[in-house]
Amino acid sequence: MKHTEVAIIGAGVTGLAAAGRLSPRNYRIFEKSRGPGGRLASKRIDAVRADIGAQFFTVRDSRFQATVDSAIAAGFVTPWQPKMGTFQDHQPIASPDQQARFVGHPYMNSLGRFLSQEIEIQTESRVQMIEPSGDRFRLILTSGESCTADCVLVTAPVDQMVAMLQYFDVQQLGSRFAMDPTWTTVLSLEEPLRGSDGESLDALFGGDHPLFDFIAVENSKPGRQSDLLVVHATPEWSQQHLERDSAEISELIRQAVSATFQVITQAKLSHRWRYARPTDPKFT
């Protein structure tokens, strides 16, 4: 049975940042999907790709700023200066701000690729259970593989973490660190997205709208050529429709976008993020 000092579960930004601080001999990182990035996700649609997870990120820490500066210099990240809007009385309006925003280049998962350049990741490896093994921990994968570790860092959403840690008293974490869902729908868009005053917009926060949480025009981001629109639904709407078929979600959101912006769209796909973000943002 293989052994490592530190086992890291999840190759999203948190897992990659932790791995970057460790000697390569001291850790193994397990990622259930085919590549790094976590919710910095993009998906191929026809001949192009669209960001279906986080639409941008901001910087609030000088250490992270240094990382972002390096990623920009290497071509993996670029600033994004969209014409911002929001919803007021359920209507789209311009709402410019001075917030510095960044996106992966050419897609959001490029930041994950940058952070993982010198990190070996065991992809398509889902950890099913973590159990005590003397003064160590034993990790059991769905593939049947197992290994031991002196320390385990779990970066998965809390509900998935609790399921892995059935041998430990962590059940209370499920309610303390609850996560909200988000339905994401990608639509075709062959004309500008405009606010109620006729001004073209690149992205909108949901404001007081009951369905829309965030909307982004893909080709407003540097490096994107696709005529696609990405819509995140609100946590409340997503929870209400959580178990519905993705085709039904696509049609509901397509109708809402078409009615709100008076544009003709075609639904391309919908993706359910069951654990999109913390219910209580004080833990972010």
Named regions from a protein language model:
Residues 20-45:
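Glycine-rich FAD pyrophosphate-binding loop
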